[in-house]
């Protein structure tokens, strides 16, 4: 499947989940706050974390663990026989199976593939290094709650954020700026919040003008999200006119970045500052181009990681 087709497929699946939730997902940082991971123990990031967390909340799953069909077969004592070209039962005592009616969701992975010539020989550069290119693949995974016959408790992720510690506006700002290397200057004043690429400054109203510290943190994280798109940082196209498609996509990146940053700080509730009309206009754009959602979440994952000091 081509990269564009995978992005469209995953983006469309996310929109279906958003329909089931009935709420704008980028205003639900609890979707991002909990740690989902594969059976090998690697935490999911970016689109995979959003996909798994959202689906887990849609279905009410308690487990944060996800398994491929291949891993489930392995736990059920099946091994692939290359000579027979099929799975055979190697451990007859195992009885691990997927519950009836359970559905998988897609996750993605970038693999580095060797470039080869028409004869199947590796292509190298002038120094003799083999040339690689990224290839996007997708896999289906099941939540561990969908599987009977195996105890997954020891594999469950630890340290899920609960949002119990509410900080002051100043503390939230300090927490973000202390981990954001080479961050823009933050200026307080006025009645608007915005990022200026020309001066590399973020302007936000004074803390006392906000309803509560979480609203302040959300607004600041949104504008810091924009700042990560500067040429000397992640180099996104952020010099756009108000209302055009590129501007809209950048706004979506900043919204997701804000939710992810809040979640990484343990904030489980997010201020509802977006109007219904704004959300409706967003959704119509995403329905026509679901791959935009895919790209925005991936970019927001990089942006939130930069702000919070996660490589």
What are these regions (language model features)?
Residues 1-311:
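N-terminal accessory/interface modules of nucleic-acid-binding and processing proteins
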